[in-house]
Amino acid sequence: MSELDKVFDELAGRRALQDFERRERQKLAAEFLTEFFEQDIKPSQTLKNRGIEAHLADNKLILHKPQSGHYEEPLYIVVGEQGEIDIAGRSLGHYQPAEKLAKKRELIGEIISFFDL
């Protein structure tokens, strides 16, 4: 086997591992966002009382006030390509299960701030 083939095989192995790790981070973050939506956003009376609707689709949580029409931007919380949580175009970093409560509270703080609750 030539040196070029050896290097190529090493690179291919590293890339496969990195891709697997990225998909795992993305899966963890998506599961967290789904749980956050189901347990904290969907049943929230505060959001309902203030006319804020929420939808979850394709690893995106979208919160908006329908009565504001198209004049007010919705708040997007998304799972990024590398498994990070992004809110309003700003990254909150990768999700780690050990930081679940802290990440939830950070998201809740951002929602409160965005909608002036």
Predicted regions and their residues:
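N-terminal functional modules and adjacent low-complexity/disordered segments of proteins
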Residues: 3, 42, 56-58, 87, ...
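Mixed-charge, Lys/Arg-enriched low-complexity segments
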Residues: 1-16, 24, 98-117
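Generic intrinsically disordered, low-complexity segments enriched for polar/acidic and small residues
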Residues: 5, 17, 29, 33-34, ...
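Negatively charged, low-complexity tracts enriched in Asp/Glu with abundant Ser/Thr
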Residues: 8-64
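Intrinsically disordered, low-complexity regulatory segments enriched in Ser/Thr/Pro
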Residues: 62-106, 113, 117
